[in-house]
Swiss-Prot record:
Upper taxonomic lineage: Bacteria, Pseudomonadati, Pseudomonadota, Gammaproteobacteria, Enterobacterales
InterPro entries attached to this UniProt entry: AlgH-like (IPR003774)
Protein name: UPF0301 protein PC1_3712
Coiled-coil region list: none
One Pfam family named in its UniProt record: DUF179
Species the sequence originates in: Pectobacterium carotovorum subsp. carotovorum (strain PC1)
Highest rank taxon of the organism: Bacteria
One GO term describing the cellular component: cytosol
Length: 187
């Protein structure tokens, strides 16, 4: 099972403070484990514009039609000082990895320098920190009914209002997440 380019949807019974009602976009899943970013937990009072100012990046030429007041997301509990940018394909960045035909992840500063300019990727999501699972750990959590999985959807990732992403991801499975029992079992 390879869950790269899938969403993990936290089951209602998952009460962990970081992952409660989370949608995690899985960027990588292989024999070493899995790595992903929470896409529905914005950081309080922290926008892309704040990040650019903190890093002394002045978008030039500035395109006023591109909003920089978009939130930065808490990607997960690990390395919360490291930035990750999910974006639609746009070549030329120093450290980009293609996740799917619709999505890339970049960790180099050069992508930040394009934000707010005409050369930025069409869609972006900026996160600090990431989520990771050791080999077999995610599979164990799936067996324990902690998560639902569904192939990722570019519209949910980049366009669905943040407060609706958890429910929208579950709806891809035909499920109203609010109607799921918190009791788990196996047939």
């Amino acid at each position: 099972m390879n869950l790269q380019h899938h969403f993990l949807i936290a089951m209602p019974a998952l009460q962990d403070s970081v992952f409660k009602r989370s949608v995690v976009y899985i960027c990588e899943h292989n024999e070493d484990g899995a790595m992903g970013l929470i896409i529905n937990k914005p950081m309080d009072q922290f926008s892309v514009e704040n990040v650019l100012k903190k890093l002394k990046i002045d978008p030039t030429p500035r395109d006023p039609a591109i909003r920089l007041d978009k939130p930065v997301f808490m990607g997960g509990p690990l390395a919360d000082d490291r930035g990750f940018i999910l974006h639609t394909p746009c070549p030329g960045f120093g450290s980009s990895i293609s996740i799917s035909e619709d999505t890339m992840i970049t960790t180099s500063k050069d992508v930040l320098e394009t934000l707010g300019t005409p050369s930025q990727p069409e869609n972006t999501l900026v996160a600090l920190g990431y989520s990771a699972w050791e080999n077999g750990q995610l599979e164990e959590e799936l067996l324990e009914n902690a998560w639902l999985t569904t192939p990722a959807d570019k519209d949910i990732l980049f366009h669905t209002p943040i407060a609706e992403r958890w429910r929208a991801a579950a709806r891809k499975l035909g499920i109203d997440i609010h109607n799921i029992s918190t009791e788990a079992g196996h047939a």
